[in-house]
From Swiss-Prot:
The gene is rpsT. Keywords: Ribonucleoprotein, Ribosomal protein, RNA-binding, rRNA-binding. Residues 1-12 have a biased composition (Basic residues). It comes from Desulfatibacillum aliphaticivorans. InterPro entries: Ribosomal_bS20, Ribosomal_bS20_sf. Binds directly to 16S ribosomal RNA. GO terms for cellular component: cytosol; small ribosomal subunit. GO terms for molecular function: small ribosomal subunit rRNA binding; structural constituent of ribosome. Residues 1-23 are annotated as: Disordered. Transmembrane segments: none annotated. Signal peptide: none annotated. This is Small ribosomal subunit protein bS20. GO terms for biological process: translation.
Amino acid sequence: MANHKSALKRAKQNTIKQMRNRSYKTRLRNMVKKVNQAVEAQSVDEAKTILVETQSIIDKCASKGVIHKNTASRKISRLAKKVEALAG
């Protein structure tokens, strides 16, 4: 356990940020799953609309420091590639 006042504050901040990051990551994973399910179901329109929402969430996670910006770019690129392959 932290002994200094500043260490106590940092420990409290870390738990708050950990919960926030966990919710962002959960939301991100769920949206990626939705895109993949739409691609597997061969529904082009649904996949495209979900992809736009997912890109927004991925960019927000990257800007807030939840995931690295290169990771965000890679995820967006791979998802877009899947959807475009489906669209033909």
